[in-house]
Regions:
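Catalytic PLP-binding core of fold-type I/II PLP enzymes
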Residues: 167-201
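Glycine-rich phosphate-binding segment of PLP-dependent enzymes
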Residues: 3-28, 35-53
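Single conserved hydrophobic/aromatic residue that forms the stacking wall/gate
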Residues: 1-5, 9, 218-225
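Active-site nucleophile and cofactor-binding loops and adjacent substrate-binding regions
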Residues: 25-32, 52-59, 82-83, 194, ...
Length: 225
């Protein structure tokens, strides 16, 4: 990577190596950690108060987002979607929809994880003109029947699913799900580890839909608001 980088990037990397301290922030706080968190708070959508924390991997970020959602709501159930990929730890494998090569032989997995159908325009068997409303109705009806809204701590979704096949949900569906979560006191977690930081043209894939998640995970860093 460094051989292909410009001299500017190389100088910045060297400066970081001169100053970097890889320690647990809770034991030995350091300025660079705080600076990164402040920048994340500035960049993520919404003008509300935000708090950021840095972790070692995307899976660890997702695990912490789920833990915080459970403590915050006092609920346990977590909803994920078909075709999802969220990591390879025990909980994130439970959230991940693909058995091979991620999950085979590694169970049993964490409980209280429920999977719902994804709004997938290319594979949708219903009316393509009404997929946004129909897929949202299918989602809310399934949650109500199988779990109960009052038991759901979090709904976690990749705004654009990566490992599932670069699946872009229909316009408006993501916002409907996010608004429904707020109405029911559920934490809406956007996992943008693969779609965040300008990979879609916007800083975050949620920006295109005007969605402000309660919790973000991105580039192996979660921002919890």
């Amino acid at each position: 990577i460094s051989s292909a980088a410009s001299d500017v990037y190389k100088r910045q990397a060297k400066n970081q190596l001169d100053d970097f301290t890889h320690t647990c922030f809770m034991v030995t706080p350091y300025e660079e950690y705080t600076a990164v968190c402040e920048k994340l708070n500035e960049l993520t959508p919404g003008d509300h108060e935000k708090r950021s924390a840095l972790f070692n991997s995307g899976a660890e970020a997702v695990e912490n987002a789920v833990k915080i959602a459970r403590v915050h709501t006092g609920r346990q159930a977590v909803v994920a979607f078909d075709h999802a990929y969220h990591g390879r730890t025990n909980l994130t494998m439970a959230l991940t929809a693909k058995n091979m090569p991620y999950k085979q032989g590694f169970g049993p997995f964490a409980g209280d994880v429920y999977r719902m159908p994804m709004a997938y325009p290319y594979r949708w068997v219903g009316n393509a003109d009404t997929i946004t409303d129909d897929a949202f109705e299918a989602f809310t009806s399934a949650v109500h029947a199988q779990i109960g809204e009052q038991n759901v701590a979090a709904v976690i979704i990749e705004p654009i699913q990566g490992e599932g096949g670069f699946i872009v949900p229909p316009a408006g569906w993501l916002k409907k799900v996010a608004d429904w979560c707020r109405e029911n006191g559920i934490v809406f977690i956007a996992d943008e580890v693969q779609s965040g930081f300008c990979r879609t043209g916007d800083w975050f894939a949620c920006d295109a839909e005007g969605v402000v998640p309660v919790s973000y995970t991105h580039l192996t860093l979660p921002t919890i608001c």
